[in-house]
């Protein structure tokens, strides 16, 4: 079953799903802006198109991830994003 989610006054939208190949995941699009997300469990983020400028927990330097790049976020933490253009992503819940 698909589950639609909307965050930050509609600037971030995602569709959650579960599949045998991916497990529990969501795909979504983020509009330009700055966002902070909290995690309940570890997440693996893959940039599908566009770019994410990310500040991960425990780091002081922002890093840019572009289409095809993957990064991991620990559970029970938060991470910060700066988005300069509409960007799509796949988030797998580990």
UniProtKB/Swiss-Prot annotation:
GO terms for molecular function: guanosine phosphorylase activity; purine-nucleoside phosphorylase activity; thymidine phosphorylase activity; uridine phosphorylase activity. The keyword Secreted does not apply. SUPFAM superfamilies: RmlC-like cupins. Its EC number is 2.4.2.1, 2.4.2.2. One of its GO terms (cellular component) is cytosol. It is an enzyme of class 2 (transferase). It holds the Pfam family Ppnp. It catalyses: a purine D-ribonucleoside + phosphate = a purine nucleobase + alpha-D-ribose 1-phosphate; adenosine + phosphate = alpha-D-ribose 1-phosphate + adenine; cytidine + phosphate = cytosine + alpha-D-ribose 1-phosphate; guanosine + phosphate = alpha-D-ribose 1-phosphate + guanine. Keywords: Glycosyltransferase, Transferase. Belongs to the nucleoside phosphorylase PpnP family. Catalyzes the phosphorolysis of diverse nucleosides, yielding D-ribose 1-phosphate and the respective free bases. Can use uridine, adenosine, guanosine, cytidine, thymidine, inosine and xanthosine as substrates. Also catalyzes the reverse reactions. NCBIfam families: PRK10579.1. This is Pyrimidine/purine nucleoside phosphorylase. It comes from Salmonella arizonae (strain ATCC BAA-731 / CDC346-86 / RSK2980).
């Amino acid at each position: 079953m698909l589950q639609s989610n909307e965050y930050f006054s509609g600037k971030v939208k995602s569709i959650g799903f579960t599949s045998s190949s991916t497990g529990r995941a969501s795909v979504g699009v983020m509009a330009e802006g700055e966002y902070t997300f909290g995690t309940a469990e570890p997440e693996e983020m893959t940039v599908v198109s566009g770019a994410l400028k990310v500040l991960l927990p425990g780091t002081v330097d922002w890093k840019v991830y572009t289409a095809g790049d993957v990064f991991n976020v620990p559970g029970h933490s938060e991470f910060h994003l700066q988005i300069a253009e509409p960007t799509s992503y796949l988030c797998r819940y580990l």
